[in-house]
């Protein structure tokens, strides 16, 4: 096995940077013991750690849960991987539950339920939604990850989105009544977050799609848990998936 070979090679040198180099080879394949070694050996965030995290994120989008576990280990050690800071072209909008980095030129309105972001002639609606199950434990969150994969990975109009190891979801393209939309569902261990970009111009929608994805991935939670007051708001996102998938996922985070 590759890791044993790498351990052998790393043991043959006293050069710490060489040892890290060896373990990186295996860590970039989402091998958890190698990632654990990296976390033990590298004290602070470095460009190599950022690259490793990015590669693990790409692996996680293909359906490998060891990449999610590895990402979580890195996030706990290097917290800056998760907390996105605004760039010079962005501004921060926030409410009781989360904050977002949005383009400076956009017009944004936000309240505790959600809000809107206007980009040229397109509008992005966003909202927070209640989490229907408890997912504080890693094994419960991995069940949600697998449910999202089973639902969206086979769909050619959908894509898996990994903002971080505890902010996972999907992006879906749709056209209805000459309105083109791109919808994002992100699920954390605390809340659900929904984003919807709508435009009558398909080219404009596609042009802003990546911008909306960037906004969604910039989401940082405050830690507050959202509880829906209206019944209609309880039947969206993961709640809807759980209702339509009778395959044991309803047991996520619930006591026997």
Named regions from a protein language model:
Residues 1-2, 6-11, 29-32, 38, ...:
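Short helix-capping/linker turns of helical repeat alpha-solenoids
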Residues 2-5, 9, 19, 38, ...:
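Structural register within alpha-helical repeat arrays
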Residues 5, 41-42, 59, 74-81:
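TPR/TPR-like alpha-solenoid repeats
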Residues 12-22, 45-54:
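Structural signature of tandem alpha-helical TPR/SEL1-like repeats
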Residues 25-26, 56-59:
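Canonical positions in the second alpha-helix
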Residues 104-108, 193-250, 256:
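Surface-exposed amphipathic alpha-helical segments
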Residues 111-207, 251, 256:
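Conserved polar/disulfide-associated segments of primarily extracytoplasmic proteins
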């Amino acid at each position: 096995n590759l890791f044993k070979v790498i351990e052998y090679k790393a043991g043959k040198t006293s050069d710490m940077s060489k040892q890290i180099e060896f373990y990186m080879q295996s860590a970039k394949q989402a091998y958890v013991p190698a990632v654990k070694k990296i976390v033990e050996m590298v004290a602070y965030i470095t460009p190599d750690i950022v690259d490793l995290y990015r590669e693990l994120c790409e692996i996680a989008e293909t359906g490998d849960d060891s990449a999610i576990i590895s990402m979580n280990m890195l996030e706990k050690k290097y917290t800056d991987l998760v907390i996105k800071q605004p760039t010079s072209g962005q501004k921060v909008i926030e409410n009781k539950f989360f904050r977002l980095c949005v383009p400076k030129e956009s017009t944004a309105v936000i309240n505790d339920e959600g809000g809107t972001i206007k980009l040229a002639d397109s509008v992005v609606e966003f909202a927070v939604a209640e989490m229907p199950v408890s997912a504080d434990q890693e094994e419960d969150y991995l069940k949600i990850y697998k449910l999202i994969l089973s639902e969206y990975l086979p769909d050619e109009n959908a894509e898996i989105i990994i903002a971080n190891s505890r902010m996972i979801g999907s992006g879906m393209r749709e056209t209805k009544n000459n309105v083109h939309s791109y919808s994002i569902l992100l699920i954390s261990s605390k809340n659900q977050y929904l984003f919807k970009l709508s435009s009558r111009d398909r080219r404009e929608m596609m042009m802003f799609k990546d911008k909306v994805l960037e906004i969604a991935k910039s989401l940082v939670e405050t830690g507050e848990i959202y509880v829906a007051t209206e019944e209609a708001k309880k039947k969206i996102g993961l709640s809807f998936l759980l209702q339509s998938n009778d395959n044991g996922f309803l047991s996520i985070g619930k006591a026997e």
